[in-house]
From Swiss-Prot:
It is an enzyme of class 3 (hydrolase). This is ATP-dependent protease subunit HslV. NCBIfam families: ATP_dep_HslV, PRK05456.1. Keywords: Allosteric enzyme, Cytoplasm, Hydrolase, Metal-binding, Protease, Sodium, Stress response, Threonine protease. HAMAP family: HslV (MF_00248). One of its GO terms (cellular component) is proteasome core complex. GO terms for biological process: proteolysis involved in protein catabolic process. The gene is hslV. Gene3D superfamilies: Glutamine Phosphoribosylpyrophosphate, subunit 1, domain 1. InterPro entries: ATP-dep_Prtase_HsIV_su, Ntn_hydrolases_N, Proteasome_sua/b, Proteasome_suB-type. It comes from the Bacteria. CDD domains: protease_HslV. Na(+) binds at A167, C170, T173. Allosterically activated by HslU binding.
């Protein structure tokens, strides 16, 4: 339960795209506290499991880092099996008293899979190979779907263009963009 007077640290757009055997994941760099931008170049993308996976987060930064650490532990325990590690993290997140309070979401991509892990314990694998989380996610998702359908752009370029579109619309998204690829 959120404390009603506690300012919420939020803002972000993270989007991942699978295309032609490659995966790209990118984010903007803005972090806000309440209605104030406190940082423009926050890094929200991490390389995991010997560079085979990329993970991005939206939500409270400390909470997201905690979840990423747990997810890395699960990856090691399950020999890099993305789906199994994601399901086990979601199970823990849903049942553990401490983890249940964490306010974040994760977007994870490999060259073959794209998943969203939510705080409600859901593991979502979109049919179109596009994952998007954060305040500008719907703008970026719409742009990515259109670019996938109507262009031959690479996964990396689709992610970058989608984030640029979100930055033009969403006040919690900026154009300090980081894109990584596996």
């Amino acid at each position: 339960m959120k404390h009603p007077k506690r300012p919420v640290i939020r803002s972000t757009t993270v989007i991942g795209v699978l295309r032609d055997g490659k995966a790209a994941l990118g984010s903007d760099g803005q972090m806000t506290l309440g209605n104030t931008v406190v940082k423009h170049s926050t890094r929200k993308i991490r390389s995991l499991y010997q560079g085979r996976l990329l993970a991005g987060f939206a939500g409270a930064t400390a909470d997201a880092i905690t979840l990423l650490d747990r997810f890395e532990e699960k990856l090691e325990a399950y020999n890099g099996k993305l789906e199994r590690a994601a399901v086990e993290l979601a199970r823990d997140w849903r049942t553990d008293k401490y983890l249940r309070r964490l306010e974040a979401m994760l977007a994870i991509v490999s060259s073959e899979r794209a998943l969203i892990i939510s705080g409600t314990g859901d593991v979502i694998e979109p049919e179109d190979g596009i994952v998007a989380i954060g305040s500008g996610s719907m703008y970026a998702l719409a742009a990515a779907r259109s670019l996938m359908k109507h262009t031959g752009l690479s996964a990396r370029d689709i992610v970058r263009e989608s984030l640029e579109t979100a930055a033009e619309i969403c006040i919690y998204t900026n154009n300090h963009i980081v894109v990584e690829e596996v």
